[in-house]
Amino acid sequence: MRITLPLLSTAVGLGLTAAVLGTGPAATAAAPQEPVRAAQLGYQPSAGSGEDAAANRAFFEAVVKSVAEKRAANPSAAAAVTVYYSATNAPSFRSQISRSAQIWNSSVSNVRLAESSSGADFAYYEGNDSRGSYASTDGHGSGYIFLDYRQNQQYDSTRVTAHETGHVLGLPDHYSGPCSELMSGGGPGPSCTNPYPNSTERSRVNQLWAYGFQAALDKALEKASQR
């Protein structure tokens, strides 16, 4: 599927259809509205493209920017990089979200996920959406993950959530991968229930948050010093 890149908004993740994004998702707790032009990475393995990689980078960079700006405002904070999320608008998936955070926190060392009641770097939402589950950002530090009810019944819910969270940490989709690869998403089919990243995925996340974050932090510190 050809994906139209957005002017302002990008969506990445596990969508059951190849529909182009319109307004925000039809969630129980309405997710932020998106511009009409946006990109979606579908759940079907054939949906991948070079433009998908650009979409994923946009989401990752938005989250990194949000975290870096907070660190720049408080340089004396602990050395560990922490990405804060809100699960307030996805109460039905609270256990899966918590489990996903635990999985990633036990798998990588350069970044940690933690829930926050305010000032989160991204948020989870839930509801019914023909596009399925996906991650979206406006490219300016505001992002969210949408978890679709039907898709989370058809596929292992913890795997879906951990997969979407992988986009937050910088990983792209790789539908042709085996079940042992978390970012293969729905490629291996509904029988795949593995919610863990493999060694290559773990290594990649550690690299991204060691080098990519430092560059973003340097930029944020420079910007803060000019104020």
Curated annotation (Swiss-Prot):
It is found in: Secreted. Residues 1-29 form the signal peptide. The keyword Protease applies. Binds 1 Ca(2+) ion per subunit. It holds the Pfam family Peptidase_M7. Its cofactor is Ca(2+); Zn(2+). The N-terminus is blocked. Residues 30-42 form a propeptide. Disulfide bonds join C179-C192. Ca(2+) binds at D156, T158. One of its GO terms (biological process) is proteolysis. NCBIfam families: snapalysin. This is Extracellular small neutral protease. The gene is snpA.
